């Protein structure tokens, strides 16, 4: 079920009225659903733009059309028009299932480690232009990672590994015993913090 607040409905209705196109609605879809890059897309939709298999949700003065393939990813979504602390108003979409769900405890350790790396660790590292890739997960629970982007050659990679990544993986994936770095940091060509200046 998708919830759309009264404020969001009023916001959309005013935008649609301004367009002046009979039958215009709003189409909601999931982009890259089930991945860390997943996002929700809202766009105007004229009747001719619709494929006919969308789910239609009647709103106050317009219809919200949900692309059929996106319906499972949008279950539980909330669309609102909120006032931020700065006084600005902003449309917000919360879609808790859009990036997929964490693997079950019965999933392999490799699947669970990869999910945490892709959905929790890499989004944080991306703020520095960095990322990590899982190279191997041993039977003993040792995770071997390769740093890339701004983390490749970074003078703070050891701190990131021990205080950030290892803590996160050991706390979120039962069975992980250690996290090791397999990166040749001397070959990094654009580190966020050069190794010789991290002291």
UniProtKB/Swiss-Prot annotation:
One of its GO terms (biological process) is iron-sulfur cluster assembly. Disulfide bonds: none annotated. The keyword Cytoplasm does not apply. Keywords: 4Fe-4S, Iron, Iron-sulfur, Metal-binding. The keyword Metal-binding applies. GO terms for molecular function: 4 iron, 4 sulfur cluster binding; iron ion binding. Gene3D superfamilies: Fe-S cluster assembly (FSCA), HesB-like domain. It holds the Pfam family NifU. SUPFAM superfamilies: Fe-S cluster assembly (FSCA) domain-like, HesB-like domain. [4Fe-4S] cluster binds at residues 151, 154. Binds 1 [4Fe-4S] cluster per subunit. The cluster is presumably bound at the interface of two monomers. InterPro entries: Fe/S_biogenesis_protein_NfuA (IPR017726), FSCA_dom_sf (IPR034904), HesB-like_dom_sf (IPR035903), NIF_FeS_clus_asmbl_NifU_C (IPR001075). Its cofactor is [4Fe-4S] cluster. PANTHER family: FE_S BIOGENESIS PROTEIN NFUA (PTHR11178:SF51), IRON-SULFUR CLUSTER SCAFFOLD PROTEIN NFU-RELATED (PTHR11178). HAMAP family: Fe_S_biogen_NfuA (MF_01637). Involved in iron-sulfur cluster biogenesis. Binds a 4Fe-4S cluster, can transfer this cluster to apoproteins, and thereby intervenes in the maturation of Fe/S proteins. Could also act as a scaffold/chaperone for damaged Fe/S proteins. Homodimer. Belongs to the NfuA family. This is Fe/S biogenesis protein NfuA. It comes from Xanthomonas axonopodis pv. citri (strain 306). The gene is nfuA.
């Amino acid at each position: 079920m998708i919830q759309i607040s009264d404020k969001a409905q009023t916001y959309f209705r005013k935008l649609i009225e301004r367009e002046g196109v009979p039958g215009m609605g709003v189409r909601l879809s999931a982009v890259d659903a089930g991945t860390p890059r997943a996002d929700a897309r809202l766009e105007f939709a004229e009747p001719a733009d619709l494929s006919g298999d969308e789910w239609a949700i009647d709103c106050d003065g317009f219809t919200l059309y949900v692309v059929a393939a996106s319906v499972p990813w949008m279950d539980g979504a909330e669309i609102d028009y909120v006032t931020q602390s700065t006084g600005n108003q902003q449309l917000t979409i919360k879609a808790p299932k859009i990036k997929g769900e964490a693997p079950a405890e019965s999933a392999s350790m490799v699947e669970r480690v990869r999910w945490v790396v892709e959905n929790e660790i890499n989004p944080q590292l991306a703020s520095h232009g960095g990322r990590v890739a899982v190279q191997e997960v041993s039977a003993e629970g040792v995770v071997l990672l390769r740093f890339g982007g701004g983390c490749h050659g970074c003078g703070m990679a050891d701190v990131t590994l021990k205080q950030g990544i290892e803590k996160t993986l050991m706390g979120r994936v039962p069975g992980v015993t250690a996290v090791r770095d397999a990166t040749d940091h001397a070959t990094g060509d654009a580190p966020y913090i050069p190794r010789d200046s991290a002291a």
